[in-house]
Amino acid sequence: MSFDISALKVLFKKVFPPKKSIYTVDTNNDGKADSLLIKVLNVIMPILVPKHIELGGFSTKNFDINKFELSDYGKMYLDEFPINVSKKDYDVEKLKGHFKFYLKAEEFTVDDLLSGKLSGRMIALGDTISILIKIDEEGLEKFSEGKHTFKFKSKIIPTLEFNFELGAENLNQKFDPK
């Protein structure tokens, strides 16, 4: 099932500002980027984080990350090139360690999200949710200066697509959780 989400493009540009949503960052203070930082700006309304998230056929209620396969829900692309995140190719525990989430500078892990640790927290209008993803050098090379497109294609929800641009202001920046 595919939907035309062209009406949401304006909203996507506000939630993911093209020059202010994606960064390569240095988390080790060694002067070299080692992670990707995605900033999501809440421009919709205050959001109370629920205990469980349900979207299409996906739910965190009885979620077991060891049985989860993202490719069952959709495929991701960067500049039309597929991004492989199959559990067949990665150790799940190691992969979980590559993701951190920040809300109001407070750090959360994948396990925190799955256990409902964020439940009941308010994401205020204007708040930014930061997603930090540790990526190897080869992966970071794909995030070069210039314009890029990220897509998530699924049969469950409409294709999600957003454009972003990387330049001196968001390449190899020092990580700040705020």
Task: Kindly label every feature range from the protein language model.
Residues 2-178:
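Terminal leader/tail segments of proteins
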